[in-house]
Amino acid sequence: MYPTSGCARVLMACPAPAMLRGPLLRPSTTAIRGLRGSPLLYHYAATSNSNMRYFSSTSRRWIKEFFAPPKETDHIVESVTTWKHPVFTEKQMKEIAIAHREAKNWSDWVALGTVRFLRWATDLATGYRHAAPGKQGVEVPEQFQMTERKWVIRFIFLETVAGVPGMVGGMLRHLRSLRRMKRDNGWIETLLEEAYNERMHLLSFLKLAQPGWFMRLMVLGAQGVFFNGFFISYLISPRTCHRFVGYLEEEAVMTYTHAIKDLESGKLPNWANQPAPDIAVAYWQMPEGKRTILDLLYYIRADEAKHREVNHTLANLKQGVDPNPYAAKYDNPEAPHPTKSAEIVKPTGWERDEVI
């Protein structure tokens, strides 16, 4: 399916020239051992402003820089985000747990059934399988055992789709607010910030791999189908869509939990001591000594857990009436209430009578 020769081709990993097989490659040879021939080109960058090519099988004229600095700008150095990520503590991130909200009505069952079908299809497409709940000690068949390459393929594919719901919901609520000439009561900002956060997950993983044409084609098809499907569904039932995203984030928390366990148990040796990309360090404000791929997975899992809570909470509200509890000021700030931080996490969401 993939070409087998030609170092100038973007999709294949070819042996590096002899003059480069020395100390220059030492930081990354471990990270990419066994991954040659992958449609994803693994590379490791020690610093964001380094021009040194630690690993790449693509000739210089074919390399596509995903994080190129601004061009033809005399005064602008970089773009600064408006949405600063809240600081998560190590204790908060390690307390995140797998959880499931039981379906209570037909809307919940539609959302849950759709998520389970999509999970099955995605697992099939990415060659993923984990032990069933209650059977964590059972060894997964060899063909389904995850490697660094398989994990990053799965992460990239999932994150390209995960940023769609927040953008669609925010866009439709924005248009609704304009059309009805009424306030949105804080929903738009939270939904757009969620989409932005998911995109930052993707950009972080793109520092570990460069997708080939087949992955890009899969993403194009999945995004086209999912965007339009979610668009129509949100017009019909926003509540069902938020419940769907809540269940989807439950699966995301489960996926990242399994990845963390694999890494901590030594099943992913190439990531054992690999530093997190600079873009991730800056976005999550990672402290010194806590800037590895393992730490990155903990941060992303905490994000997904928060999205799980937010969407389950939004699904519990009256969609066209209630204000967004995550963008609200409360009469008693000392009482437990929804926040953007991970200080308080309710996996199954806040009930309406708890926040409104």
UniProtKB/Swiss-Prot annotation:
Its cofactor is Fe cation. One of its GO terms (biological process) is alternative respiration. CDD domains: AOX. Belongs to the alternative oxidase family. This is Alternative oxidase, mitochondrial. Its main location: mitochondrion. Keywords: Electron transport, Iron, Membrane, Metal-binding, Mitochondrion, Mitochondrion inner membrane, Oxidoreductase, Respiratory chain, Transit peptide, Transmembrane, Transmembrane helix, Transport. GO terms for cellular component: mitochondrial inner membrane. One of its GO terms (molecular function) is metal ion binding. Fe cation 2 binds at E198, E249, E304, H307. Binds 2 iron ions per subunit.
